[in-house]
């Protein structure tokens, strides 16, 4: 059996604008220029003002111009993206945090940083705060999200202070005249705003990316990776349906949801999730909570349970996934079950990063064991994959024969179902 692990690099390999910063740039562009008349996706992607801000979109447009210039942009969805992002403080925070020099933004790390600031603040506040502007980053975040305001008078020793807005103050218990910060309202407001960003991202991927993939797949120039031609199960961290529409409709598990359902934007477990110190105040922001609530990993766990029962092993191929420690629970599970492991990389820097990340997850000893016992091997995407594909095909044929035997047995089982 052959299993494929996918990350966003898979979409990038196919020149699709699925990075978070592509979404930010397009959403901001729609806000500023949509009324100029943008009938087709190509009218947006070809605009020099957008391309100057986002050179990768220019690259995608050059690759897929024929398709983009003929796919109609949904006015209703474009307007909804604009409405969801307008005045959304998470969206403006992400936009301001975008590193123009590096050309990327890590939503998860930014969310984790913001939540850490609010968690520290709310854990330590039992009365109405009057906070000196000491920690610049923390103060900026607390004020940016609209819960605080500067006072008109100076605080201690002439230092300006920041106070919470009355909207977020409650009397507790009722009638006691004891005023407290309404922690639940602050957390639910943060969660609601982030949910709107997730909705906007889903709409962007739906009407700018997903809708184009079937058309791109039919084009003779469409780029396809020979190494993943014989896959039985796919575990994807992507929101798009690129693999299904360009390669195979075999069983695929979208752990973070996809454009046809809810999508997950959140952070990983931390010390607040340990049983000794568990704090569920911010649990709705955690990916494991969202995967459970929206049931995006339900089918995946059923499949893993089946593997545990049958003791069936598999060849695992990873493509476009950073193998970062943020997804270590899934990575460890798949790597532990795999008989052989192949990691595809697009350049030497990526290979270095993959090796370093796996060492972080497994440690040196277990990393060496993976190389020694599970044939952990790294392959460049620029190589000839003919022999590699033949190897995977033989694994897939083994599964076929285990399930159905010879062709006659397969035909009988098929018609009897």
Language-model features, listed with the residues they occupy:
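PAPS-dependent sulfotransferase catalytic domain
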Residues: 295-301
């Amino acid at each position: 059996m052959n299993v494929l692990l996918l990350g966003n690099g898979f979409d990038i390999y196919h020149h699709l604008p699925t990075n978070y910063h592509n979404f930010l740039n397009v959403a901001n562009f729609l806000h500023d220029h949509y009324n100029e008349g943008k009938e087709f996706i190509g009218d947006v992607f070809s605009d020099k003002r957008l391309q100057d801000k986002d050179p990768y979109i220019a690259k995608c447009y050059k690759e897929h111009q024929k398709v983009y210039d003929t796919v109609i942009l949904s006015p209703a969805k474009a307007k909804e993206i604009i409405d969801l992002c307008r005045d959304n403080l998470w969206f403006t925070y992400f936009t301001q945090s975008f590193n123009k020099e590096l050309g990327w933004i890590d939503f998860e790390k930014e969310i984790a940083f913001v939540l850490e600031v609010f968690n520290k603040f709310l854990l330590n506040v039992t009365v109405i705060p009057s906070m000196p502007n000491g920690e610049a980053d923390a103060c900026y975040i607390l004020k940016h999200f609209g819960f605080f305001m500067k006072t008109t008078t100076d605080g201690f020793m002439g230092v300006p202070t920041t106070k919470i807005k009355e909207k977020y103050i409650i009397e507790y218990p009722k009638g006691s005249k004891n005023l407290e910060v309404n922690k639940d309202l602050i957390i639910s407001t943060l969660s609601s705003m982030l949910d709107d960003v997730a909705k906007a991202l889903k709409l962007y991927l739906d009407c700018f990316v997903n809708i184009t993939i079937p058309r791109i797949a039919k084009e003779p120039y469409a780029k396809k990776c020979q190494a993943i031609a014989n896959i039985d199960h796919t575990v994807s961290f992507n929101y798009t349906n690129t693999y299904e529409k360009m390669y195979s409709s075999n069983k695929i598990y979208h752990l973070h949801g996809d454009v046809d359902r809810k999508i997950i934007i959140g952070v990983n477990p931390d010390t607040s999730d340990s049983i000794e110190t568990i704090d569920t105040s911010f649990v709705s922001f955690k990916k494991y909570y969202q995967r459970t609530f929206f049931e995006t990993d339900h089918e995946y766990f059923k499949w893993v349970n089946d593997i545990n029962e049958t003791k069936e092993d598999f060849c695992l191929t990873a493509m476009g996934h950073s193998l970062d420690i943020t997804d270590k629970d899934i990575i460890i599970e798949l790597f532990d079950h795999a008989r052989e492991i192949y990691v595809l990389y697009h350049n030497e820097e990526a290979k270095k990063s993959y090796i370093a990340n796996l060492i972080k997850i497994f440690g040196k000893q277990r990393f060496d064991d993976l190389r020694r016992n599970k044939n952990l091997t790294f392959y460049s995407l620029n190589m000839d994959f003919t022999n590699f594909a033949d190897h995977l095909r033989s694994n897939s044929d083994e599964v076929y024969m285990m399930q159905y035997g010879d062709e006659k047995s397969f035909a009988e089982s098929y018609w009897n179902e």
